[in-house]
Swiss-Prot record:
This is Collectin-11. One of its GO terms (biological process) is neural crest cell migration. Belongs to the COLEC10/COLEC11 family. It comes from Danio rerio (Zebrafish). Lectin that plays a role in innate immunity, apoptosis and embryogenesis. Calcium-dependent lectin that binds self and non-self glycoproteins presenting high mannose oligosaccharides with at least one terminal alpha-1,2-linked mannose epitope. Primarily recognizes the terminal disaccharide of the glycan. Also recognizes a subset of fucosylated glycans and lipopolysaccharides. Plays a role in innate immunity through its ability to bind non-self sugars presented by microorganisms and to activate the complement through the recruitment of MAPS1. Residues 124-148 form a coiled coil. Residues 149-265 form the C-type lectin domain.
Length: 271
């Protein structure tokens, strides 16, 4: 490529001289002249590597790359601040009635009084009590169908209540839920239930204070007598702490929140 350029340059120079000679040949003296032809030299050897140049300007932003795979799951962060208190929830159901409280201390002695009028009044009241007692016996036997043994009076209450409510009802009338402590009492209560056409009633036995340790409702321990149905007590669902009697006289442990009829027991000498 360089050689071709050199030949072309020489031809142009010769043609230029020939043209000058033809134009100005008559007037030019024939004196010798020198012609200098400048010919580019050959390519030199490569020089030494120069110093590192300054950084160029930032290039254009390249196209967006493909989405990379998800990174590893980060560590669990620290708990945030407590949020605002939520709205007040609905009012809950009324709970069961609690056990009766302990007996309070005796009151202060009364002031002295004239007792003669009171004795007369008490005598008159005793007469009325005798009359009322006779009337009550009639009601027991003829209307209410109350059952009696040598020492106990049993009252069947045909009003469905939970266990604790039933015991409070009996206590409010001077008694407790029926506590069959021997075979005779158990037969009397079972016969009462059968005669009334019922299938089951609450009786005064539970293990509310210690699971599996059944006691009578007035907290006296059970001794030798029991009438559990086969497979009972089984504490099904871990929620059977009270006892029912079925018409056959057998006992079954049941949940205390069930509602059913019940039998109250009273000492005969207090009725």
């Amino acid at each position: 490529m360089v050689g071709e350029k050199l030949v072309a340059y020489m031809l142009v120079s010769v043609l230029g001289l020939a043209l000058l000679r033809s134009v100005f040949g008559q007037h030019m003296p024939e004196e010798p002249c020198s012609v200098q032809i400048l010919v580019p030299g050959l390519k030199g050897e490569a020089g030494e590597k120069g110093e590192k140049g300054a950084p160029g300007r930032p290039g254009r932003v390249g196209p967006t790359g493909e989405q990379g795979p998800p990174g590893d799951k980060g560590q669990k962060g620290s708990p945030g601040r407590y949020g605002k208190m939520g709205p007040t929830g609905p009012k809950g159901l009324k709970g069961d009635m609690g056990d009766p409280g302990p007996k309070g201390p005796n009151g202060e002695p009364g002031v002295p009084c004239e007792c003669a009028p009171l004795r007369k009044m008490i005598g008159e009241m005793d007469i009325q009590v005798v009359q009322l007692t006779n009337e009550l016996k009639f009601i027991k036997n003829a209307v209410a169908g109350i059952k009696e043994t040598d020492s106990k009076v049993y009252l069947l209450v045909k009003e469905e209540k939970r266990y604790r409510e039933a015991e409070v009802f009996c206590q409010g009338r001077g008694g407790h839920l029926a506590m069959p402590k021997d075979a005779a009492a158990n037969r009397a209560i079972a016969g009462y239930v059968t005669d009334a056409g019922l299938s089951r009633v609450y009786i005064g036995i539970n293990d509310l204070e210690r699971e599996g340790h059944f006691v009578y409702v007035e907290r006296s321990p059970m001794t030798t007598f029991s009438r559990w149905r086969e497979g009972e007590p089984n504490n099904a669902y871990d929620d059977e702490d009270c006892v029912e009697m079925v018409s056959s006289g057998e006992w079954i442990d049941v949940a205390c929140q069930l509602t059913m009829y019940f039998v109250c027991e009273f000492d005969k000498d207090t009725v």
